[in-house]
Swiss-Prot record:
This is GRF-interacting factor 10. Coiled coil: none annotated. The QLQ domain and WRC domain may be involved in protein-protein interaction and DNA-binding, respectively. Residues 113-148 form the QLQ domain. GO terms for cellular component: nucleus. The lineage of its organism: Eukaryota, Viridiplantae, Streptophyta, Embryophyta, Tracheophyta.
Length: 269
């Protein structure tokens, strides 16, 4: 038994005596697990290449679409572009620097720098500044609160700023609610009707309603004696007419009574 085993596998025992036989021995077959792993790696590589190709195709289509959108959106007329004034840009930059310095000067944990009302007023003033920087007329509803805050701070405010920067020509009443339609006559019937005419400069009413409701002076005319049409004589002088009127007024009421009572006495007799 031992002899047969040695004959079948001569390399098992004393294999070191025959080196040529060791070189001719076949290599061991690879395991099944390694083969499956290599196949999985190859499959994943192919899937990655396919995904990459699909992405490139989609990216090319997206770039085409983006190019079309850019052609539609980014094309601007050079004549319409506004040219920024360097002075305004410098003023805006200086204002931003001042605000940053003010915010940086507030210590940590000191609380809010402004109250809610102050923040609201600051926002409103920034809107007014935006209109002024754009060289556009500032709306009146933004100017009125600022004017009221300035005039209400002291009794001299209304004297220093009585016309609100030249808006007195709009016939606006700064003591009450703002006028919704400046420049229109204020004459109304107390309900819904309102005059549609324009006002006189620096006034509240139009020419028709300017003197409405005021007492007008009564003009006194002296009536001269009527000339006789038949005789064609000239009318008497105004001096003579006044003298005759004075003589008529000088008659006492007693004489008038006697003149009226005389016929009654004659009838009784």
């Amino acid at each position: 038994m031992t002899a047969e085993g040695e004959a079948k596998n001569p390399s098992a025992g004393g294999g070191g005596d025959n080196p040529q036989h060791q070189q001719a021995a076949p290599a061991p077959a690879p395991a099944q697990g390694e083969v499956a792993q290599e196949a999985a790696v190859q499959g994943t590589g192919q899937e990655q290449e396919r995904d990459k190709a699909d992405r490139e195709v989609q990216g090319g289509a997206g770039e085409k679409d983006d190019g079309a959108c850019r052609d539609l959106v980014l094309v601007e007329d050079p004549e319409v572009l506004a040219v920024e004034d360097p002075e305004e840009a410098a003023a805006t930059a200086a204002l931003q620097e001042e605000m940053k310095a003010l915010v940086a000067s507030i210590p940590d944990g000191a609380g809010a720098a402004f109250t809610a009302m102050q923040l609201q007023e600051l926002e409103q003033q920034s809107r007014v500044y935006q209109y002024m920087a754009a060289r556009v007329p500032v709306p009146t509803h933004l100017v009125f609160p600022v004017w009221k805050s300035v005039t209400g701070a002291s009794s001299e405010g209304a004297q220093k700023y009585p016309t609100l920067m030249g808006l007195a020509t709009l016939c606006l009443d700064f003591g009450k609610n703002p006028e919704p339609e400046p420049g229109r006559c204020r004459r109304t019937d107390g309900k819904k009707w309102r005059c549609w005419r324009n006002t006189i400069p620096n006034e509240k009413y139009c020419e028709r309603h300017m003197h409405r409701g005021r007492k007008r002076p009564v003009q006194v005319f002296l009536e001269d004696d009527e000339p006789d049409s038949a005789s064609g004589s000239k009318p008497a002088a105004p001096g003579k007419a006044t003298e005759g009127a004075k003589k008529a007024d000088d008659k006492s009421p007693s004489s008038k009574k006697l003149a009226v009572a005389a016929p009654a006495a004659v009838q009784s007799t």
